């Protein structure tokens, strides 16, 4: 069905005869494949007698060859998967050798931090998981998710989203709305040799939340901000290049060398916040982060430091 999708991705009308001739199948077979696209990927296809078929909106489909040409590690592009992070870990368990990159057009069980569901409609956003082998102990993991945030921030700015900023520990926001998130998952002993999946989700061309997905926080996308469809292959290429650059800096010099840069882009630097840790809510003012990426808060006149995990940060005056 991939060949049919590539013909339809321009959002223009195509007759059944034209589509069948291009793919080498009958018009009846085209009809069946169109029905399968609608049911499997929840795509809306308009059917107009005398004009043919078109997608409700154009798509920017990912192309494995274009992505692989700009990437220094193996790339797997899937049409649909439960979770790219889960798939990367399955491949590790099956004997795959990192580094490797898993990308999907759609996730059926995409997830974010703290078990939250990540809306993952077909062909609209980016679902990206990079599996790495990490040696050298905890130093190589310190601040890693924040470093990924810096790479993602540069990729967004390169795409024209200059207002994007960071929210500790793993979110990127524009105008108070979430545009991207990061989920790191470990396998093995972090004190010795382990593997880490850098999971990245970016709202690229999403215009409305997919049916059945109630997104529990304000969100935006590159398309909404820029007012036009974004080439997702170009964005993947940019993100991968930035990731390689920042990961090299982190490996050689640690997060401490990037701490000031991260703080300069932290949207809530100096703000009054509420930090939820289980049933406990801690109110304080953001001082920044330390050399390990932990959050520094001034709480009742004293500095306290908090690491990631199941912590949730919001502005103090948020309802």
Question: How does the language model describe each region?
Answer:
Residues 171:
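Conserved active-site carboxylates
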Residues 47-49, 167, 289:
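Short, ordered beta-strand-loop transition motifs
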Residues 79, 166-168:
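Short loop/edge segments at beta-strand edges and connector loops
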Residues 1-26, 32-33, 136-164, 174-319:
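Long, positively charged amphipathic alpha-helical accessory segments at protein N-termini or as interdomain linkers
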Residues 1-157, 178, 230:
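N-terminal lobe of the biotin/lipoate ligase/transferase fold
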